[in-house]
Amino acid sequence: MDMRRLVGRNFARLRLAKGFTQERFAEVSGVTQQYVSGLERGKRNPTVVTLYHIATALGVPPVELVTPDEEASRESARSPKRKSRKK
């Protein structure tokens, strides 16, 4: 699975579990609502520092944002493996 999508999926799940709207999370974390939306859609590639700040605002360890869940593991297993091309 693409890491941006994985982080976005985990972030959205954790944000909702903590009861934050995108707007409220943006206010408490210092990012914009547009950034939050892009992150959840897998369109943003957050830095390690940004992941740390997001995790802190959620009250979770940063590893929670990058750990595959069961759905991600199943999706990865279904994806065809890319063969490396040797030149």
Task: Describe each PLM feature range.
Residues R9, G19-F20, P46-V49:
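Residue-level signal for the short linker/turn that defines the boundary of a DNA-recognition helix
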Residues A12, E23, Y52:
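Residues within the helices of the helix-turn-helix
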Residues L16, E27, T56:
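Alpha-helical residues within the helix-turn-helix
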Residues Q22, Q33, K43-R44, P62:
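The DNA-contacting recognition helix of HTH DNA-binding domains
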